[in-house]
């Protein structure tokens, strides 16, 4: 069924980008599949130029690979990718927390605590989307204060690659419960003024692939691409 042409205050390229990302998030464009530019252009009612520009952005972010004269492939998220992303996010968030530490006052800490309480409520109500949103907002408090927009952009893009590609439909409750404990421990370190310890905890526990591996395997167990590119 043909989709109505996109009408929005955003540029056509931005609209097409948002559409493609939403298709990936919902699992309509699965890892390993291909994108037909001709068909997609007709479906959206746009020319190939904004579509090409959107695909170039997606390629820079690691979501697709453009093969000249061969087509566009939606990238597979392999176990090695996940390991690499955890290393990168851990290092960057650790740096961000150190840079922002002196700006984390009572209002910011209360905001972070509020997100933790929201995560607990989300687990009780089996609302994964709410849990995910509160989790992101917790980290966004110190990311937003670190003063490095490039760092923040990279972290957010990698999180989308990890958890929005496509969005999993259920909890790994043991992981979410453990994660809440980690957020509470991080808040405790921040409250005690232990900047170095808090930064190390982010890097070496919260974003440690080795620490989180058993949960990661459960989270991606329904993703064939994960197992086909399994532990190396």
Name these PLM-found stretches:
Residues 175-232:
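C-terminal regulatory/effector modules of DNA-binding transcriptional regulators
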Residues 103-168, 181-185, 197-208:
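Conserved amphipathic alpha-helical segments that form helical-bundle/coiled-coil interaction surfaces
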Residues 1-98, 102, 214-232:
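Short linear motifs at protein or domain termini
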Residues 11, 109-110, 174-177:
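Short helix-capping and inter-helix turn/linker motifs at the boundaries of alpha-helical repeat units
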Residues 60, 64-65, 158-160, 175-176:
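Mobile beta-alpha loop/short-helix "lid" or hinge segments that flank ligand
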Residues 13, 86-89, 131-135, 176, ...:
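Amphipathic, non-transmembrane alpha-helical scaffold segments
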Residues 72, 80, 98, 117, ...:
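Positions in alpha-helical segments
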């Amino acid at each position: 069924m043909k989709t109505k042409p996109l009408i929005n205050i955003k540029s056509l390229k931005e609209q097409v980008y948002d559409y493609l990302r939403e298709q990936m998030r919902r699992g309509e464009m699965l890892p390993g599949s291909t994108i037909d530019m001709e068909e997609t252009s007709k479906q959206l009612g746009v020319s190939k130029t904004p579509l090409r520009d959107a695909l170039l952005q997606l390629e820079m972010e690691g979501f697709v690979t453009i093969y000249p004269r061969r087509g566009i492939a939606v990238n597979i998220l392999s176990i090695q990718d996940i390991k690499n992303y955890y290393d990168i996010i851990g290092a960057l968030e650790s740096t961000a927390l150190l840079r922002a530490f002196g700006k984390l006052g009572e209002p910011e800490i209360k905001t972070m605590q509020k997100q933790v309480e929201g995560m607990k409520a989300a687990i009780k109500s089996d609302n994964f989307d709410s849990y995910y949103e509160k989790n992101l907002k917790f980290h966004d408090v110190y990311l937003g204060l670190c003063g490095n927009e490039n760092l923040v952009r990279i972290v957010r893009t990698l999180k989308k690659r990890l958890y929005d590609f496509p969005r999993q439909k259920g909890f790994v409750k043991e992981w979410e419960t453990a994660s809440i404990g980690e957020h509470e421990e991080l808040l405790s370190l921040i409250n005690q003024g232990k900047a170095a310890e808090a930064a190390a905890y982010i890097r070496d526990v919260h974003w440690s692939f080795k620490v989180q591996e058993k949960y990661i395997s459960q989270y991606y167990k329904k993703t064939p691409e994960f197992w086909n590119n399994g532990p190396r």
